[in-house]
Structures are given as structure tokens and as C-alpha cells.
């Protein structure tokens, strides 16, 4: 049994030692390479800052190198804040470039248009002009018309099938600058912008309206900006970063991308606005790859740049734009028809058939595709219907929006049988006709129309086709349709879908064996050259936690230096914005970015300060680690992996750290209060003496109460033992207290103080003068206290008497000195007073004399002036005499 007890004691001791020396505590690390997803605004950087849309972007120095990270991260091109911001920002630029400012609602009136032109372009058709369709037995044209750079029809705009531009001249009457008089105006419209009523065949004019009048109020652009492409890149604010999936197998969604790189800015991109195709993209490679939506069949296909696919569009004619003043403040841009120009058109260059064939082969190999493997059954098709931007290929050419009918192009690429098509569509050509609209449907927000003033002159634009927007549908493995799409937003998912915006979280929590932070001798290191960039410390993101923790000082310094550098660049841009009268979408983003960066840094420092770890790279605390079973593998785990493991503990640890810091501050406050005892002068402070007196009174009262309690306890103990105190009164003062005894009990004999009588009564003594005794003892105690206090005060007086005498003598000497100085001051003041009085008298006499002289001079001058007429009269009298 004894051996078992010894073993149990040894086990308890070992457990106690283990609990003392093996407990782990929370340690705060600042500068760890970790991050989390973010949704804050990005800002732009560009080399070409002389265009209207990029004046407020940061200058692009091209130094945006990428660092490879040994981590695994998830990427999604559709659920992505970078692509969503790009779509919204480009839309804002698009809307700003054609921002309306003049209401054209007065033009929603009846216009008289040339009937022959309205009949020609299919707006009206009387009963006498109806023509029958061509007979089915007519020969079908299957001619393949191809054009290239050397074709003569390109320069002359007379390639086969191209017609004149569909323009109609109209007249309307309304009030002009003179509101009480009407005026007739002439205006030229595109046929697609008008809607006409069916008129009589004898009329020479058709009644037409603007086709927007039944939907909304159109406004005309009043600035000189046109929607031209803008090249720029997105950059993350300080404290944030952009991760990119560098895996060639990435197809728009990858939950575990192992090839991750980090940078502060994206690649350069262009503001594309077109349907069906993407132009001048930056993602083209020597391969064809597909971004496929994770939940439906929306795709964006990047075309192989090896095939050199191009599209060149042209709007022929020397168009003239004439502003027409409708009324005060309203100007409408008119287009007088000098001669009938050819319609706009586009032709396609490059190996398009080979490119489309490779697209089909890539679709077959894609893991999401489960349709037919026969590429002959995969067809490129046009959408069935909808808005013009869907049924036509819609693009912008230097401010003019072209709507191109793509039947000829699809027939040529797919080698279709054209015998069953309409007469005008029975051709295989590598060029397509286009028509122009001035009233367009916007691509980002539904139901809003804008009016664009046309550009003058001959317009030509050349583009490189880099992507294809399509929906891929298949049925039971028989047929697969690649239906061209009008989702303009998909272009930016291809451009930026491999990026991901993250917020750098440099504060990490991990358990260590050190309980508190101890400061040792610090050595001042020489300042080294700043080599790492703002994101340099993320290079250790794939390293183990132990290795990354060894460079926290340099990493945190790099983080702060990068924030300061980017803040200075943003500040320069904000200063330049003060000179601008009009801000683009980048103006507010730059301001938001600056505020976001400052807020993030201050937030991190405030959090560290709340834990008592401000401006420390490694901060040990007194908070025990809450989960002993969860510890990091310092040699294998990365900080990003560790942050994911302890994410559920972060809130609890944060609360414990704050509570520990509050307790630490309370302890420091109490410690600071004790520091006042180090100063000898504080001992003579009046407030301190009052405290000392209070403490003395408390001690005296405590001693008195303690003595009384001890005495009472001793007295009660002796009374319970049956002994009479030695200071009790003599027997004559005893008062017998009779008690009734049970007759059946035997009588006690031999009891001290008892006569041995065997009756039923007995008595025991009680001190009747006990109160007198207490009073005498209290008087003695008070006398002792009085004598001691008197002795203390007399000795204090004896000690303080020489000090008071010296102080009195010093005060007397000071008084004598002050009285002497006061006498000197009084004498000096009297002398100064007399001098001032003498000066005043002298100045008064001088001024009085000067005033008399001045008055005499003025009086003589006045008399002389008044005597001038008299002298003149006297002179004339002498002359006449």
C-alpha cells in the first residue's frame, strides 16, 4: 500500500512538471505569407495616358514580375471579383464615352420621308410595288467569292453583293428658336432607326417615326469622345495581391490549381465590345483552349494565333456631319446625302477553316463534352433570334456600330449546301455586308438606348480575332451546335478569369513553448538595399512555417515599404485629378484604393496593438493555446495551410488575447502607481500624508479590535473550563443563581466551592463587576494611546522645530530681499513717472508751438489768396489810368 502511494505521488509530481514546462502559449507572428479572398476595388495602370479614358490611370512602368508559389488554390472565372469589376468598369467607360446630355424627345414626331427610299429598304410597300419571289426552278448561285489584300474590289468598295448604304431622307416641321413660328428641317436617317406607316400608293411621302419612341427617351452624346479601344491593366491596392493559375489545363474552373503565381497587376488588356468574336485579346496562344462555365454550356473559346485570323471592316464614303439647331440648347447631328455611299462591310483573313476545325477537335477532347465525336456533326450556327446585337455580329469601328449579317461567312467556313437558302444568302464568301445603327441597345444593361453622332470621313479598322463566344449544345450524341453568343461579358472572363484577388493577412497565430516576450540587447543593423518588391515576402508562401518565420523582420519591412511606395504613386495621380473637369470611373477607384490601403494597414496595427504586439514581428503572450491536440508541423506545413486549420479558433483566440492585454494594462497601471514611491519628494505630498494618516488610524483600530477579540476568546475559554479569573471580585460579591436539579440524579460531592449539601438546588458564581473591569481596561488602553501619541507628537515637534526655525529665518531673509527690490522698483517707477511727465510737457509745448506756427502760416496763406482778386483789380485800375 505504501509503495502504491509513493508511485501515485511520483506520477502527480511528473504531471505537474509536465503541465508547467510543456504548456504551449499563443504566439503572434506579423509578416507571415498568408491570404484570404477579397472583393475590394482595383485600379488601372497604362502606358498610353493621353486618351480620355486613361488620364487618371497610374503610369505603367512594365515592371510587374510574377513570383511562383508552391501552393494549391482554387480559381473560378465566373465567380470572380476581378472579372466582375472589369465588366462593370468597361461598361462605365462605354457609357461615359457616349454619355448623353441633350434630350431628343422632341424628335418623336411625324416625319415625311421619301417613299421610294422607304419602299426600297422594306419599311413600306404599297400594293403596286409588291413583287413575287423567284421561281424555285431558277438556277441557284453557288459561286464562292473570295477577297484578299490584292483584290481590286476592296479599294473600290464594289465587291459582289455589296449594296448602297440604307439611308432615307426625311422632313419634319417644329418650332425653332422662335417659339411662335414653325420651321421645316431636313434629316437623314439609317433605315434601321425608323419605323413607317403603310401609306397610299399615290403618296410620294411616307409617315415615319424614330423607332425608339415607343420605348424610351433617347439622348444625344454631347462630347467628342468615341468608343475607341483602351489598353490598360488592373493593379491591386497595397496590402492585396493577384494570384494567377498558370496551369495550361485551366478551363475557367479548377478547385485545386497547383501552379500558382502572384503579382501586383494583371496582364495588359483591351476594352472589347463585340458579339460573336473577341478582338485583339491578350490570351491567344499557339493552341486552342476553352473556358467552360461550371453549371451550363456557356463557353469562351480562345483561337490559335497560328492561323493569323483577322477581320478588317470599312465604312466607305466621305460622310459629312451637319449640326442642326432645333431650339435653344438642342443640337441634332444631321447627315446630308451628297452621294449614295456604299454600305459598310467586313472581310475575314487567315486560315479560318483550319481554325474552326481545330475548335471542333478541342471541343471533342474537353472533359465537359459528352456529345458526338464526329466533327462533321459539329456545326457553327447563328442564333435563332432576339435583339439585333444577337442575330448580327455587332462590333464597333471607330465610333460607328456595325451590325454584320454573317450568313456568307458561315456558309464559307462550314462549306454549307446553299441551295435551300434565300436568294441573297446563297453565297460562300469571306466577307459580309454590314449596316450601321445610331440607336443601339447597350450590352450590359437591358432596355437602355443611346444615340451616337456619326463620324465623318472614310472609316477603316483592322482587328485580330482572338476568341469566339458560343453556347455548345448537343442532343444524344447526334448533332452538336456551336451557337454564337452575344455575351460580351464573356470576353473579360477569358482575359482575366485566371486571376484571383486576395487580401494579404500578415498576422498569424501559432502555439509555442515561450510564455512571455523578453527583450534582450538589440543590435543596430546596417541598412541594406531594398531588393524585394511589395510582394517579395509572398515568395516564402510555399515554404515551411519554421523557415518562413526566420525572415519575418525583412518581410514586414518589405510590406510596409511597398505600401508607402504605392501610396505615393496613388497620391500623384490624385493630385493630377484636381486639374480635370470630368472624372472617369478610375477617378473614384483611385481614391477608394488609397483609402482602402490606409485602412488595412491601420486595421492590422490596431489589432496588434489590442493584443499588446504593436510593431513586433514575433510576440509571445501569456494566453494558453486553446487546443492542445492541434499543433503545427513547422517543417512541413505552410502558413496558408495552417491558417485554414485554425480558422475556427481565430475568434476565440482573439478574445483571449484581448482579455489578456486588458489584464496586462491593469497590472501595468498598478505597477506605475508603485513607481511614485521611488521619488523622495512624493513622500511629503499633502495627499500622501493624508493617506498615511488614514493608514495609521486603520492600523491602530485594527490592533485595538484584535486585542479585544483575543481577550474575549481567552475569557470565554476559561469560563467554559469552570475557573474564576484571578481579577474577579471577592466571594462576598457573588450572586447565587439557583438551578433546579432532577431528584433522581445523584448529588455530586467533593466539588470545590460546594458544601456537599444534598438538596435539589446548587449555585455557580458570576462576576457582577466585570463591566467595571472592562471599563478600567479600556481607560488604561486609551491612557496608553494618549501617552504614546503625545510622545510621538512631542518628538515630531522636536524634530520639526529646527526645520521650522530655519524655514522661518529663510522666509525672513526672502522678505527682506523682496522689500529691498520693491523699494528699488518704487524709486525707479517714480523716476520713470517724472521722466514721462517731463517728456509729455516738452512734447505738448513743442506741438503747441508748431501748431501756432502752422496756423499763422495757413492764415497768411489764406489772406494772400483772398487778396489776389483785390490785387488784380488794383493792377487793372493802374493799367487803365
Curated annotation (Swiss-Prot):
| Keywords, in A-Z order | Apoptosis, Cleavage on pair of basic residues, Coiled coil, Disulfide bond, Fusion of virus membrane with host membrane, Glycoprotein, Host cell membrane, Host endosome, Host membrane, Host-virus interaction, Lipoprotein, Membrane, Palmitate, Signal, Transmembrane, Transmembrane helix, Viral attachment to host cell, Viral envelope protein, Viral penetration into host cytoplasm, Virion, Virus entry into host cell
Tell me the outcome of changing residue 723 to C.
Answer: Reduced Env internalization. Mislocalization over the entire plasma membrane
**GO function terms (MF aspect):** structural molecule activity
The residues that the database entry marks as glycosylated are 37, 70, 114, 148, 158, 186, 200, 204, 214, 246, 249, 280, 286, 297, 308, 318, 373, 379, 462, 478, 627, 636, 652
Task: Give the organism, scientific name.
Answer: Simian immunodeficiency virus (isolate Mm251) (SIV-mac)
Membrane-side (Extracellular) residue stretches: 20-696
Region feature (Disordered): 737-761
CDD domains, alphabetized: HIV-1-like_HR1-HR2
Signal peptide limits: 1-19
Cite the SUPFAM superfamilies for this sequence. Answer: gp120 core, Virus ectodomain
**Which InterPro entries has this protein been placed in?**
Gp120_core_sf, GP41-like, HIV1_Gp120
Q: What does this protein do?
A: The surface protein gp120 (SU) attaches the virus to the host lymphoid cell by binding to the primary receptor CD4. This interaction induces a structural rearrangement creating a high affinity binding site for a chemokine coreceptor like CCR5. This peculiar 2 stage receptor-interaction strategy allows gp120 to maintain the highly conserved coreceptor-binding site in a cryptic conformation, protected from neutralizing antibodies. These changes are transmitted to the transmembrane protein gp41 and are thought to activate its fusogenic potential by unmasking its fusion peptide.
The record places the site described as In-frame UAG termination codon at 736
Q: List the disulfide bonds.
A: 44-57, 101-222, 108-213, 113-170, 235-265, 245-257, 313-346, 397-461, 404-434
Residue span of region V4: 404-434
Q: What is this protein called?
A: Envelope glycoprotein gp160
Q: Specify one Pfam family.
A: GP120
Q: Where is this region: MPER?
A: 673-694
Give the start-end ranges of region V5.
477-484
Amino acid at each position: 500500500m505504501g509503495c502504491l502511494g509513493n508511485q501515485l505521488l511520483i506520477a502527480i509530481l511528473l504531471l505537474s512538471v509536465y503541465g508547467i514546462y510543456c504548456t504551449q502559449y499563443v504566439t503572434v507572428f506579423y509578416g507571415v505569407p498568408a491570404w484570404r479572398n477579397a472583393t475590394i476595388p482595383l485600379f488601372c495602370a497604362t502606358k498610353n495616358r493621353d486618351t480620355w479614358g486613361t488620364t487618371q490611370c497610374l503610369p505603367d512602368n512594365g515592371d510587374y514580375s510574377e513570383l511562383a508559389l508552391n501552393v494549391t488554390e482554387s480559381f473560378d472565372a465566373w465567380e470572380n471579383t476581378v472579372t466582375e469589376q472589369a465588366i462593370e468598369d468597361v461598361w462605365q467607360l462605354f457609357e461615359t464615352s457616349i454619355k448623353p446630355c441633350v434630350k431628343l424627345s422632341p424628335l418623336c414626331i411625324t416625319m415625311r420621308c421619301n417613299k421610294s427610299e422607304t419602299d426600297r429598304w422594306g419599311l413600306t410597300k404599297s400594293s403596286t410595288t409588291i413583287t413575287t419571289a423567284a421561281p424555285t426552278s431558277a438556277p441557284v448561285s453557288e459561286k464562292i467569292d473570295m477577297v484578299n489584300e490584292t483584290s481590286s474590289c476592296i479599294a473600290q468598295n464594289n465587291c459582289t453583293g455589296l449594296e448602297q448604304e440604307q439611308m432615307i431622307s426625311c422632313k419634319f416641321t417644329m418650332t425653332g428658336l422662335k417659339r411662335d413660328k414653325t420651321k421645316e428641317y431636313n434629316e437623314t436617317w439609317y433605315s434601321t432607326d425608323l419605323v413607317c406607316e403603310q401609306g397610299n400608293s399615290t403618296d410620294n411621302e411616307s409617315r415615319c417615326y424614330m423607332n425608339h419612341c415607343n420605348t424610351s427617351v433617347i439622348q444625344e452624346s454631347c462630347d467628342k469622345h468615341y468608343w475607341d479601344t483602351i489598353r490598360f491593366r488592373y493593379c491591386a491596392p497595397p496590402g492585396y495581391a493577384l494570384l494567377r493559375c498558370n496551369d495550361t489545363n485551366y478551363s475557367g474552373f479548377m478547385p485545386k490549381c497547383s501552379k500558382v503565381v502572384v503579382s501586383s497587376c494583371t496582364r495588359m488588356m483591351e476594352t472589347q465590345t463585340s458579339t460573336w468574336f473577341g478582338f485583339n485579346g491578350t490570351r491567344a496562344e499557339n493552341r486552342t483552349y476553352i473556358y467552360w462555365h461550371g453549371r451550363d454550356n456557356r463557353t469562351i473559346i480562345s483561337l490559335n494565333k497560328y492561323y493569323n485570323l483577322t477581320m478588317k471592316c470599312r465604312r466607305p464614303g466621305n460622310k459629312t456631319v451637319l449640326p442642326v439647331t432645333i431650339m435653344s440648347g438642342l443640337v441634332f447631328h444631321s447627315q446630308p446625302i451628297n452621294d449614295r455611299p456604299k454600305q459598310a462591310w467586313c472581310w475575314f483573313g487567315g486560315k479560318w477553316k483550319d481554325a474552326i476545325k481545330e475548335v471542333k477537335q478541342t471541343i471533342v477532347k474537353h472533359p465537359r463534352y459528352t456529345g458526338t465525336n464526329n466533327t462533321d456533326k459539329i456545326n457553327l450556327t447563328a442564333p435563332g433570334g432576339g435583339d439585333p446585337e444577337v442575330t448580327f455580329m455587332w462590333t464597333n469601328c471607330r465610333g460607328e456600330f456595325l451590325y454584320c449579317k454573317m450568313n456568307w461567312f458561315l456558309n464559307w467556313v462550314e462549306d454549307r449546301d446553299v441551295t435551300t437558302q434565300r436568294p441573297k444568302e446563297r453565297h460562300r464568301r469571306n466577307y459580309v455586308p454590314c449596316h450601321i445603327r445610331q440607336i443601339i441597345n447597350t450590352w450590359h444593361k437591358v432596355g437602355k438606348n443611346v444615340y451616337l453622332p456619326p463620324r465623318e470621313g472614310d472609316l477603316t479598322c483592322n482587328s485580330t480575332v482572338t476568341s469566339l463566344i458560343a453556347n455548345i449544345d448537343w442532343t444524344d450524341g447526334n448533332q452538336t451546335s456551336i451557337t454564337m453568343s452575344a455575351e460580351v461579358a464573356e470576353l473579360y472572363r477569358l482575359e482575366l478569369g485566371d486571376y484571383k484577388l486576395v487580401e494579404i493577412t500578415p498576422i498569424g497565430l501559432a502555439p509555442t513553448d515561450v510564455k512571455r516576450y523578453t527583450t534582450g540587447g538589440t543590435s543596430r543593423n546596417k541598412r541594406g538595399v531594398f531588393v524585394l518588391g511589395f510582394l517579395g515576402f509572398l515568395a516564402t508562401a510555399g515554404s515551411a512555417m519554421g523557415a518562413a518565420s526566420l525572415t519575418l523582420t525583412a518581410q514586414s519591412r518589405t510590406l510596409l515599404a511597398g505600401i508607402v511606395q504605392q501610396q505615393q504613386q496613388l497620391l500623384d495621380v490624385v493630385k493630377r485629378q484636381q486639374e480635370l473637369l470630368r472624372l472617369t470611373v478610375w477617378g473614384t477607384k483611385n481614391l477608394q484604393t488609397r483609402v482602402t490601403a490606409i485602412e488595412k494597414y491601420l486595421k492590422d496595427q490596431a489589432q496588434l496593438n489590442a493584443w499588446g504586439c504593436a510593431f513586433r514581428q514575433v510576440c509571445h503572450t501569456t494566453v494558453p493555446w486553446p487546443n492542445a491536440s492541434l499543433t503545427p508541423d513547422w517543417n512541413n506545413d505552410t502558413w496558408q495551410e495552417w491558417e485554414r486549420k485554425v480558422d475556427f479558433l481565430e475568434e476565440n483566440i482573439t478574445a483571449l488575447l484581448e482579455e489578456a492585454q486588458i489584464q496586462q494594462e491593469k497590472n501595468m497601471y498598478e505597477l506605475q502607481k508603485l513607481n511614485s514611491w521611488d521619488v523622495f519628494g512624493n513622500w511629503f505630498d499633502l495627499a500622501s500624508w493624508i493617506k498615511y494618516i488614514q493608514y495609521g488610524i486603520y492600523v491602530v483600530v485594527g490592533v485595538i479590535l484584535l486585542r479585544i477579540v483575543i481577550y474575549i476568546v481567552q475569557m470565554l475559554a476559561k469560563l467554559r473550563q469552570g475557573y474564576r479569573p484571578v481579577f474577579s471580585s471577592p466571594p462576598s460579591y457573588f450572586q447565587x443563581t439557583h438551578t433546579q436539579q432532577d431528584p433522581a440524579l445523584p448529588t455530586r460531592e467533593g466539588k470545590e466551592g460546594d458544601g456537599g449539601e444534598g438538596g435539589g438546588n446548587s449555585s455557580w458564581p458570576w462576576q457582577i463587576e466585570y463591566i467595571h473591569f472592562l471599563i478600567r481596561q479600556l481607560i488604561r488602553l486609551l491612557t496608553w494611546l494618549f501617552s504614546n501619541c503625545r510622545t510621538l507628537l512631542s518628538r515630531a515637534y522636536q524634530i520639526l522645530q529646527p526645520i521650522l526655525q530655519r524655514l522661518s529665518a529663510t522666509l525672513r531673509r526672502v522678505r527682506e530681499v523682496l522689500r529691498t527690490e520693491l523699494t528699488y522698483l518704487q524709486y525707479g517707477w517714480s523716476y520713470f513717472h517724472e521722466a514721462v511727465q517731463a517728456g509729455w510737457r516738452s512734447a505738448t509745448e513743442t506741438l503747441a508751438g508748431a501748431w501756432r506756427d502752422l496756423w499763422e502760416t495757413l492764415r497768411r496763406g489764406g489772406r494772400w489768396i483772398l487778396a489776389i482778386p483785390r490785387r488784380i483789380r488794383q493792377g487793372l485800375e493802374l493799367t487803365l489810368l
